């Protein structure tokens, strides 16, 4: 997105001032200069020197979130309650934060014990270290239950 005409950088080079001066001469007094025609994003002119193949769409970056899982848990606990997008974003950030803390603590534990692999034991210990009291106990029991279910299936 191009900056507005009113905003000017503190120090301009002489080469940057010339195109702006040319545009000002072309436009009649009191009228805005006409916008240049632009092609839709991803479509280049035939004569342009871009190395992209014509007709290819730009791939979207996939952003992984916990939103669908948060929503599923919410509906299990309170089927009649919804959640705003801002609250969902906060919950997603919260889960990412807890995940990073647990992963960091697990990595430290593996390094201390000179082990190359993070196992369920390191995860369980890091949960006990990161989460407080009763919350850690419930998290450990739910985690153990999930691992048992996964290995038996």
Swiss-Prot record:
Bias (Basic and acidic residues) occurs at 1-28, 36-53
- Organism superkingdom: Eukaryota
Q: Name one Pfam family in it.
A: Histone
Which key words are in the record?
Acetylation, Chromosome, DNA-binding, Isopeptide bond, Nucleosome core, Nucleus, Ubl conjugation
Modifications the protein undergoes after translation, according to the UniProt entry: Can be acetylated to form H2BK6ac and H2BK33ac.
GO terms for cellular component? nucleosome; nucleus
Give me the ranges of the annotated region Disordered. 1-61
Q: Which family does it belong to?
A: Belongs to the histone H2B family.
Q: How does it assemble?
A: The nucleosome is a histone octamer containing two molecules each of H2A, H2B, H3 and H4 assembled in one H3-H4 heterotetramer and two H2A-H2B heterodimers. The octamer wraps approximately 147 bp of DNA.
Q: What is the name attached to this protein's record?
A: Histone H2B.4
What species does this protein belong to? Answer: Oryza sativa subsp. indica (Rice)
């Amino acid at each position: 997105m191009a900056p507005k005409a009113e905003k000017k950088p503190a120090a301009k080079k002489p080469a940057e001032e010339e195109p702006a001066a040319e545009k000002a001469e072309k436009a009649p007094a009191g009228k805005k200069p006409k916008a240049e025609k632009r092609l839709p994003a991803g479509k280049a002119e035939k004569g342009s020197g871009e190395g992209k193949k014509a007709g290819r769409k730009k791939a979207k970056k996939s952003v992984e979130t916990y939103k669908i899982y948060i929503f599923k848990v919410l509906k299990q606990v309170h089927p009649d309650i919804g959640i705003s997008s801002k609250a969902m974003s906060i919950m997603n950030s919260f889960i990412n934060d807890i995940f990073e803390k647990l992963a960091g603590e697990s990595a430290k534990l593996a390094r201390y014990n000179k082990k190359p692999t993070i196992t369920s034991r390191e995860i369980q210990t890091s949960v006990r270290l990161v989460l407080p009291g009763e919350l850690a106990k419930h998290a450990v029991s739910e985690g153990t239950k999930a691992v048992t279910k996964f290995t038996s299936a």
